[in-house]
């Protein structure tokens, strides 16, 4: 058992009024337990309602006593993780999206599953985060964090892009493809998995490089130590190309641009029910390793 949480900060999925019933249910449940409860400032501004709760920003939250509960889907949880990574505030995800692979609970489970967590009966893990910088003509023009993946990709046309990749200053390959995913272990069950990459356990100290539709039969996904610095240079493109971080932004690229990716010094801190394990989630949500003939 660890220290019980002293306050809860609620975060909602942005631009989605359908989360309001779930937020009200969470608010009522927490207040009935005399738990000091706040609504994240941007969430309140987005839904246009404070739900009668005091507002608190991520910057004002306390990593030593506060719990962030993010209500939404995986996108909400990823955005919350980027916001809290520097401070180390723990996050619990409650799914109100579709699959919700990263969110441990559904809104219907809170009465049973949430009290033990609030009282300190939980497990936690630190998830690595990627730091990406976009350099153009020796000038840094963009920087950001990614919990799942850094994605370098072609625009809307049919032509591939060409990328040259180096690792710690050593040449890895030059490939023509629709794109390149550099994923964390957390991101290995997202886009990288759909593109044929392997699944990594969440706390493994590794990164994945997965090409999207490469024009070759031999460039397989690559797992490397997360201590390396990866530099991907856009060497050719007949159309637009872009850089995306967790799919939440898209930055246009130009020929000669370099994207420098390394593990960030901060990490995402996720909270889970005590009885949960990663392989249970894989089986339950992705039907991983199902035996033939089983339901």
Swiss-Prot record:
Name listed for the protein in its UniProt record: NAD kinase
InterPro entries: ATP-NAD_kinase_N, ATP-NAD_kinase_PpnK-typ_C, NAD/diacylglycerol_kinase_sf, NADK
Single annotated GO MF: ATP binding
Superkingdom: Bacteria
Top-level EC class as recorded in UniProt: transferase
Organism: Acidithiobacillus ferrooxidans (strain ATCC 23270 / DSM 14882 / CIP 104768 / NCIMB 8455)
Family, as annotated: Belongs to the NAD kinase family.
BP GO annotations: NAD metabolic process; NADP biosynthetic process
Stated role: Involved in the regulation of the intracellular balance of NAD and NADP, and is a key enzyme in the biosynthesis of NADP. Catalyzes specifically the phosphorylation on 2'-hydroxyl of the adenosine moiety of NAD to yield NADP.
